Amino acid sequence: MTSSAASSPALDDIEEGIALRPKFDAAGLVTCVTTDARSGEVLMVAHMNAEALEKTVQSGEAWYYSRSRKRLWKKGESSGHVQRVLEIRVDCDQDAVWLRVEQAGAACHTGRQSCFYRRIDRDGSGAPLLTMVDADRLFDPAKIYPK
């Protein structure tokens, strides 16, 4: 696995080749979309640095990089709700990663199955309004993540 800053492979090699050459951003991160392998539901969007991607590939469990905590984290390390990776894909220019996983428990730190539990609607005046959908909690986050 190489960083695009270290080398500049030809576009055709990136788009059509078989070498994994993730294109990390200036902060050393790549966006990762994680979906449920069975249902296809989007569970979360997070970021990976080179180490998180490598650990995910090697271990078969999802690892991410937290921008707010500035550290690597294994999904489920606190909650026990790990993600077993069934498939990893990269997009055409290798600047985004897609994980298809078997999710144990909830994916969201709020206790919900998915981090995408609010839909943008409009109120009577046309202003944006968030509507809760699929918002049932599978666990109480206060019991798992004490403050």
UniProtKB/Swiss-Prot annotation:
InterPro entries: PRA-CH (IPR026660), PRib_AMP_CycHydrolase_dom (IPR002496), PRib_AMP_CycHydrolase_sf (IPR038019). Keywords: Amino-acid biosynthesis, Cytoplasm, Histidine biosynthesis, Hydrolase, Magnesium, Metal-binding, Zinc. The gene is hisI. Binds 1 Mg(2+) ion per subunit. Its main location: cytoplasm. Belongs to the PRA-CH family. It is found in: Cytoplasm. Zn(2+) binds at residues 92, 108, 115. Pathway: Amino-acid biosynthesis; L-histidine biosynthesis; L-histidine from 5-phospho-alpha-D-ribose 1-diphosphate: step 3/9. The keyword Phosphoprotein does not apply. It catalyses: 1-(5-phospho-beta-D-ribosyl)-5'-AMP + H2O = 1-(5-phospho-beta-D-ribosyl)-5-[(5-phospho-beta-D-ribosylamino)methylideneamino]imidazole-4-carboxamide. The lineage of its organism: Bacteria, Pseudomonadati, Pseudomonadota, Alphaproteobacteria, Hyphomicrobiales. Its cofactor is Mg(2+); Zn(2+). GO terms for biological process: L-histidine biosynthetic process. This is Phosphoribosyl-AMP cyclohydrolase. Homodimer. Mg(2+) binds at residues 91, 93, 95. It comes from Rhodopseudomonas palustris (strain BisB5). Catalyzes the hydrolysis of the adenine ring of phosphoribosyl-AMP. GO terms for molecular function: magnesium ion binding; phosphoribosyl-AMP cyclohydrolase activity; zinc ion binding. Transmembrane segments: none annotated. GO terms for cellular component: cytoplasm. Its EC number is 3.5.4.19.
